């Protein structure tokens, strides 16, 4: 690492030892890919000597690397497989909070029986979000795209449905472009609402096979609908998700929140920096945040760029564009 060796700061050395050959190899990754990623992200050098790693770099980075390696090794001991994306998420977590514990985050599982798969949080805020949904009847997830707000809410909803904790899942989105007046659009109802709701269908079909999902939709057990279709209803024994809530008006948000019936949960997700409402219209999500933040039983969870769960190249592309624009 030329940048490392050219630094004028004093370089320090640390040795990290692992007692299990097989787990050490898993930790290092295929072709030592996990170690190369740690070198790149933390700007340190790592030399392998059997089960020992010799780390060289600045002291804060070495402390982070040692903490990271020991915690990842602990996860491997508990049977959690470590991939490069896990290393990447872990570096972000520990760089933001060196006291953070990875086990409670990565070993938390949302089980989806329909696909026999588990979905796990990848950041501290994602873990807080999942716990909040378990513990509260109304949860707001606010933050940028790609932070898992809708996906995790959907996972919790489908998991609850499969475990028969609820009878129905309702997924809603404001249809901003149509001003929620779908009569302006040609075609039948499905054709009218489908473009606005496609992202919700995509997330749904990622969690259950197409036939099962379609069958549940036809039976009304899973409902995907524009926000306007919630008016006048009371939803009992349901898990209700409002996506893109920043594009709801205050009237629509009030209408939506008062649909909540007995034994139901609702999760509202949105990004208050991406409001597409017509000029002069205020966001129902912003008003709800201002009015409801102190009500017991309602939880607000905020996500940041550090929670973005994407292909590493996507993050680099975003960074490159942001750099060019400043």
Task: Please tell me what each predicted stretch does.
Residues 113-242, 246-326:
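Conserved helicase motor core of SF1/SF2 NTP-dependent helicases
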């Amino acid at each position: 690492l030329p940048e490392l060796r050219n630094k004028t700061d004093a370089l320090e050395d640390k040795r990290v030892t692992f007692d299990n050959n097989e787990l050490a190899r898993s930790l290092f990754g295929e072709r030592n890919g996990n170690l190369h990623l740690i070198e790149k992200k933390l700007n340190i050098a790592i030399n392998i000597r059997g089960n020992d790693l010799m780390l060289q770099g600045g002291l804060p980075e070495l402390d982070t690397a040692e903490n990271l390696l020991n915690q990842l090794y602990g996860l491997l001991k508990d049977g959690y497989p470590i991939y490069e994306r896990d290393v990447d998420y872990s570096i972000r977590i520990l760089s933001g909070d060196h006291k953070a514990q990875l086990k409670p985050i990565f070993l938390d599982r949302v089980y989806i029986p329909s696909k026999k798969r588990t979905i796990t949080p990848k950041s501290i805020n994602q873990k807080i979000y999942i716990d909040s949904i378990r513990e509260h009847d109304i949860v707001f997830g606010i933050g940028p795209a790609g932070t898992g707000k809708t996906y995790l809410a959907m996972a919790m909803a489908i998991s609850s449905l499969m475990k028969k904790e609820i009878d129905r899942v309702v997924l809603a989105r404001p249809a901003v472009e149509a001003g929620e007046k779908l009569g302006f659009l040609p075609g039948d109802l499905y054709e009218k609402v489908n473009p606005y709701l496609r992202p919700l269908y995509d997330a749904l079909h990622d969690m259950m096979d197409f036939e099962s999902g379609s069958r549940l939709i036809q039976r009304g057990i899973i409902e995907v609908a524009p926000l306007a279709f919630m008016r006048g209803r009371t939803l009992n024994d349901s898990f209700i998700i409002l996506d893109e809530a920043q594009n709801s008006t205050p009237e629509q948000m009030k209408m939506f929140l008062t649909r909540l019936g007995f034994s139901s949960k609702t999760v509202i997700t949105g990004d208050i920096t991406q409001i597409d409402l017509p000029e002069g219209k205020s966001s129902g999500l912003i008003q709800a945040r201002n009015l409801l933040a102190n009500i017991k039983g309602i939880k607000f969870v905020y996500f940041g760029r550090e929670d973005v769960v994407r292909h590493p190249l996507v993050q680099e592309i975003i960074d490159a564009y942001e750099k060019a624009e400043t």
